[in-house]
A protein has these predicted regions:
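Surface-exposed extracellular loop regions of Gram-negative outer-membrane beta-barrel proteins
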Residues: 204-250, 333-383, 443-451, 510-512, ...
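Sec-dependent N-terminal signal peptides
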Residues: 2-10
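Exposed, low-structure sequence patches enriched in small/polar residues
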Residues: 304-306, 312, 372-651
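Structural preference for beta-rich elements and adjacent junctions enriched in aromatics
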Residues: 10-335, 339-340, 349, 631
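Short, solvent-exposed loop/turn segments at the edges of secondary structure
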Residues: 86-88, 102, 359-361, 389-391
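Outer-membrane beta-barrel transmembrane domain signature of Gram-negative proteins
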Residues: 187-206, 328-362, 485-541
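Short secondary-structure boundary/capping segments
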Residues: 266-270, 364, 393-394, 424-426
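A generic structural motif
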Residues: 59, 88, 244-246, 343, ...
Length: 651
């Protein structure tokens, strides 16, 4: 029977057992493998740039080999676990090791060998970070590229039943998606191919344990204004206990995040603070387990942590994460969340947060996904116990992936006295209604998406209007080109300005080959709080010779009530050797009054392992009022971090 027909009809794969990886690779010459099916932008069971997959296993690992035919490979992301990989060429392998059809380990990689891993629940309603023991070996060939994925059984939890497997391949230049099994949703776990293994042949080692002490030593030189240089010697330490990939305990004292890259500045016309993402490792690992539908704790508000404890454990159904942090400003902050995953795409969460002497909160949240209609039903109820203030949030969302109708409807109610320093909620005593609608369709190879949104925020007790926003738009794409046109209308009474209206039209153009090979240009014009606004944004990302990545952003602003005239930024990832990377950043801001500011930042990192490395970072702020530049602040940090797994001494 033809293997492609076999998998489409029976949805079963019975892979061959091999002695080791080498014997699996030798068998590729005689085993025909499985072909992926093109499902977007049009369907084709034999696409010209085809993909052949081989699957096998040994006593300690699962093997997946992919042969990818392609002219003009596009990949530039080199940072592990970066979502930028989604704009590159990539392969994504789902493995449902419990056979329940509601959760899967995910292994994603691009032709550069950059890896991303996560745990996906049915329909993509929840994505959990996960760092497992797996590797991928990629190689460019005359016909495209090859990849070997090896997943060690000891790094995953599994049941001795039929597993599930889905394999996806994305080709960036044509936005082409290929699947092993055609399903209504590319994020669907239920209905993927059955993977039948003989568990009598699998040797399962005892759970792997790690006990890793990590010591950090750093020397800092700091200079502010016209004062003298100040030198500091600082230290920090972390003790980490890890059981497999599911349980982790971290104890940290005087953590340092000087090697964390800076934020790329964004301009927010709504006059609210930008919610920049968390980047500090202590708060990132396990963050997905404490995430709620409305962000009740923003970890970036914990700016100066002195010590911290973190614990999380992931079970088949029950998971828990807890953080307890001592901060220089907020004193003691603690937050935790437990989640229970039911069989039928239903997740229930219980959350708690407290800050010393000022804040105590309990909440419950739920997410129900209905795959037949691609619908999420999301809800949250919480109560600030010290202020007896409630929050209620309900959202109904229908997902639209490639074509068809998508929409969301939501309602948010917050009582008075709910605002706290540890979250990012700017308004209390409010009720907010939001709605969005979009419809996507294809004309030949042209993708067209028409959309609109509306939201209104009112005082919960007086019904006074606080803000109202709406805007239609349309986007058209023919890979690698795209074009969008739309408008944004808003009445933002919370600004307190005499004329609080914002009426802006925009048009944008983009050309994108991969995450670091793209350019976009947008034009915005209209009325902005009673003044004329003209705003041009240019974005350019380059990957010269596929050796390093460099990005440029330029924002030109012409508006009487905005102080900035232009903001120019440079950032990048520049490998100096195999393990040494330089990450530069420059922000040059010009003001209308003739005042200029420059912020320089750079990190040179030598990463020996995830727990050991050497780092050199610098920061320098300059200003010019007239013709002379003055240094306002500068800092240089040299840091050594060393960690070792003590369990290696036992083995």
């Amino acid at each position: 029977m033809n293997l492609l027909l076999y998998i489409l009809v029976s949805l079963q794969i019975v892979p061959t057992f091999y002695k080791n990886e080498q014997s699996f690779m030798k068998d590729l010459k005689v085993n025909p493998g499985f072909k992926l099916i093109k499902v977007y932008p049009n369907e084709d069971i034999e696409p010209p740039e085809s993909t052949t997959i081989w699957i096998g296993y040994s006593q300690d690992a699962l093997y997946v080999f992919a042969r990818n035919y392609q002219k003009g490979i596009q990949a530039s992301t080199r940072k592990r676990d970066s979502e930028n990989i989604m704009a590159d060429d990539w392969i994504l392998v789902y493995v449902d090791t419990q056979g329940r059809g509601n959760e899967a380990y995910c292994f994603q990689f691009n032709p550069l060998g950059t890896k991303r891993d996560f745990i996906l629940t049915e329909g993509g309603s929840n994505v959990e970070e996960w760092d497992g023991d797996w590797y991928v070996d990629v190689k460019n060939t005359e016909y495209g590229w090859d990849a070997l994925l090896v997943i060690h059984f000891k790094s995953i939890s599994f049941a001795k039943t039929d597993w599930g497997i889905q394999i996806e391949r994305y080709i960036a230049k044509s936005t082409e998606l290929q699947l092993l099994v055609k399903l209504p949703s590319f994020q669907q776990v239920k209905g993927i191919a059955a993977l039948k293994l003989d568990f009598n042949k699998i040797f399962i080692e005892s759970a792997s344990y790690s006990l890793i002490p990590i010591v950090e030593l750093r020397v800092e030189k700091e200079h502010s204004g016209e004062g003298e240089d100040n030198f500091y010697f600082r230290y920090g330490a972390t003790a980490r206990f890890k059981e497999g990939s599911g349980t982790l305990l971290d104890l940290t004292h005087r953590p340092d995040f000087s090697d964390v890259e800076v934020d790329i500045e964004q301009i927010n016309l709504e006059r609210l603070p930008v919610n920049y993402p968390e980047k500090r490792p202590f708060f990132i690992e396990g963050k997905d387990l404490i995430s709620t539908p409305i962000e009740l704790v923003r970890t970036r508000n914990i700016e100066y942590p002195v010590a911290g404890l973190k614990f999380y454990t992931r079970g088949k159904k029950l998971s828990f994460a807890g953080y307890f942090v001592k901060d220089s400003l907020l004193k003691y902050v603690g937050f935790s969340r437990a989640t229970y995953s039911f069989e039928k795409n239903f997740i229930l969460g219980i959350f708690n947060a407290s800050a010393q002497g000022s804040f105590t909160l309990y909440s419950m949240d739920m997410n129900l996904y209905i795959p037949q209609v691609k619908m999420d039903i999301i809800g949250l109820w919480g109560k600030r116990m010290d202020a007896k203030s409630n929050i209620i949030y309900v959202k109904l969302k229908r997902r639209q992936e490639f074509k068809g109708l998508g929409f969301s409807l939501s309602y948010l109610s917050i009582d008075s006295s709910f605002i706290s320093p540890i979250h990012l909620i700017y308004f209390d005593r409010v009720k907010k209604y939001s709605a969005s609608l979009n419809y996507q369709f294809l004309l030949s190879k042209i993708n067209i998406n028409v959309y609109g949104n509306y939201s209104t925020r009112k005082d919960k007790y007086t019904n006074e209007l606080i803000s109202e926003e709406y805007g239609p738009g349309i986007s058209v794409s023919l890979a690698p080109f795209s074009f969008s046109l739309g408008s944004s209308r808003a009445l933002l009474n919370y600004t307190g300005l005499p004329d609080a209206r914002m009426d802006i039209n925009f048009i944008s153009f983009a050309y994108s080959l991969s995450s670091w090979k793209n350019i976009s240009l947008s034009f915005n014009s209209g009325k902005y709080f009673g003044s004329d606004l003209k705003y041009i944004a240019l974005r350019l990302n380059l990957s010269p010779f596929n050796k390093f990545n460099i990005g440029f952003q330029e924002d030109f602003i012409d508006c009487d009530i905005m102080p900035e005239k232009s903001v120019f930024q440079i950032f990048g990832e520049i490998p100096l050797t195999y393990a040494i990377t330089f990450k530069p950043y420059l922000n040059y801001k010009k003001y209308k009054e003739g005042y200029d500011e420059v912020a320089l930042n750079g990190i040179i990192s030598y990463d020996i392992s995830s727990t050991t490395g050497i780092y050199l970072g610098f920061t320098k702020n300059l200003s010019k009022n007239g013709k002379k530049w003055e240094s306002n602040y500068e800092k240089i940090v040299f840091k050594i971090k060393a960690g070792y797994d003590l369990m290696n001494l036992i083995h």
